[in-house]
Amino acid sequence: MNLIPTVIEQTNRGERAYDIYSRLLKDRIIMLGSAIDDNVANSIVSQLLFLESQDPEKDIHIYINSPGGSITAGMAIYDTMQFIKPQVSTICIGMAASMGAFLLAAGEKGKRYALPNSEAMIHQPLGGAQGQATEIEIAAKRILFLREKLNQILADRTGQPLEVLQRDTDRDNFMTAEKALEYGLIDKIFTNR
């Protein structure tokens, strides 16, 4: 069951009901709380573009609790975060895994955070192929290319040498908030506002 809370606000014109995500958007907060697919990416990208149009100078905050998902969908979010004028802060709540961790690291340097009991997980891209040998070869080359591209971006975002990223993403690599801070995925652990 997908229950979305409603928030009632009092205004000088009476009461106004919002779903919680719309109300958070008014405060420039975007929630990424699911696996990342094309629909989720389109929603996040649309919200980023909308908030930029509202005020290109004011920060946007993305709260992340995601197991990851599609690389291409995640890259659409990443590219938009880099493209828009407002700085984007990222906050890990719960778990930022795979593409979720990649997007956590993609926040504005100095504005990437985690709550104390949250976790991050990085690994190499997952994929599979079937069909003729040529099709499998094409898919294998593509996933190797994506692995190198993602590792290079993560190396740039974390300050880790590329060789370290290649080693550390070879298998699932879980990190506490403290380890994510030490690694360079985040810049600070939030304990309160």
From Swiss-Prot:
* UniProt enzyme class: hydrolase
UniProt-annotated location(s): Cytoplasm
Write out the entry's keywords from A to Z.
Answer: Cytoplasm, Hydrolase, Protease, Serine protease
Q: Which GO terms describe its molecular function?
A: ATP-dependent peptidase activity; ATPase binding; serine-type endopeptidase activity
Kindly give the SUPFAM superfamilies that the UniProt entry links to this protein. ClpP/crotonase
Give its E.C. classification number: 3.4.21.92
Q: Does the keyword Hydrolase apply?
A: yes
Q: Which cysteines are joined by disulfide bonds?
A: none
Q: One GO BP annotation here? A: protein quality control for misfolded or incompletely synthesized proteins
Q: What does this protein do?
A: Cleaves peptides in various proteins in a process that requires ATP hydrolysis. Has a chymotrypsin-like activity. Plays a major role in the degradation of misfolded proteins.
What protein family does this chain belong to? Answer: Belongs to the peptidase S14 family.
Q: How does it assemble?
A: Fourteen ClpP subunits assemble into 2 heptameric rings which stack back to back to give a disk-like structure with a central cavity, resembling the structure of eukaryotic proteasomes.
For this entry, the protein name equals ATP-dependent Clp protease proteolytic subunit 2
Species whose genome carries this gene: Bacillus anthracis
What's the source species' lineage? Bacteria, Bacillati, Bacillota, Bacilli, Bacillales
